Amino acid sequence: MKKKALLPLFLGIMIFLAGCDYSTPEKQDGFFFNTFVQPMKHLLQWLGNDVFHNNFGLAIIVLVLFIRLILLPFMLSNYKNSHMMREKMKVAKPEVDGIQEKVKRARTQEEKMAANQELMEVYKKYDMNPMKSMLGCLPILIQMPIIMGLYFVLKDKLVNGLSEHPHFLWFNLTKPDIWITVIAGVLYFIQAVVSSKTMPQEQRQMGYMMMVISPIMIIWISLQASSALGLYWSVSALFLVIQTHFANIYYSKLAKKEVQPFIEKYEREHNPYSKKKGKNTQVVSKKNKK
């Protein structure tokens, strides 16, 4: 559901980006411009002109790292919740599937409410909170106004000094560049692949769709804007690939360790052999004492 909700969001952003124009002074007003575009303009001017002495490429890279560090606590929390939910669902799935069948067969509203209440009890039993998965959208929602502000700053050439010092590496930051655009698209595809490895099987199809949609959107928007936006996305995607890879390794081990008590409890409750084995062990220990 979370991934599906992002599709209309991206579509709305594309329409918004296509319709706004801040290229002339008389148009540079309004809530969005004053809240997001103007601060981004001043920040880039300060980093590019004063801190890095007319190197706006380095200014954009530092800006990416700064934004990513702000988002890091939200991202780590999202990784942890995702891994915990997936591991706990492996244990709770038989019970959840049984209750969901009850919901489908329910003929009255009272029966549905009773089944849903039973489902909530199962979630509580395994310390699961499905609402936490909704927080996965939070880093995207926080970052979107920042990216959109940067988009208009670069598209409408609002940063003083950038036109005089536009070069970074092999490309001109004020013009589209096919290679940095392709790099951004490829890196976002890799990031989607890395993220999809931890998705539950039922969510894989939507994950594969995002693998295609995200790079296409990145490439399309980057070709409409200057290569500075492609640089922003390339550095951001590279950071995400590294962050996601190591977070998946760490939180996968942590989730399996924390879920182990639930697995052992489930096996004791649902595996008669383990109960008999436990009783036999107690009998043997008593005989040994005698």
Swiss-Prot record:
Alphabetical UniProt keywords: Cell membrane, Chaperone, Lipoprotein, Membrane, Palmitate, Protein transport, Signal, Transmembrane, Transmembrane helix, Transport
Covalently lipidated residues, kind S-diacylglycerol cysteine: C20
Pfam families reported for this sequence: 60KD_IMP
Compartment(s) where it occurs, according to its Swiss-Prot or TrEMBL record: Cell membrane
GO biological process: protein insertion into membrane; protein transport
Lipid-bearing positions (N-palmitoyl cysteine): C20
Signal peptide, first to last residue: 1-19
Record-linked CDD domains: 5TM_YidC_Alb3
Primary localization class, coarse: membrane
Membrane topology (UniProt): Multi-pass membrane protein
Region spans: Disordered: 270-290
Comp. bias intervals (Polar residues): 280-290
HAMAP family documented for this protein: YidC_type2
Name recorded for this polypeptide: Membrane protein insertase YidC 1
Species annotation: Staphylococcus epidermidis (strain ATCC 12228 / FDA PCI 1200)
Gene: yidC1
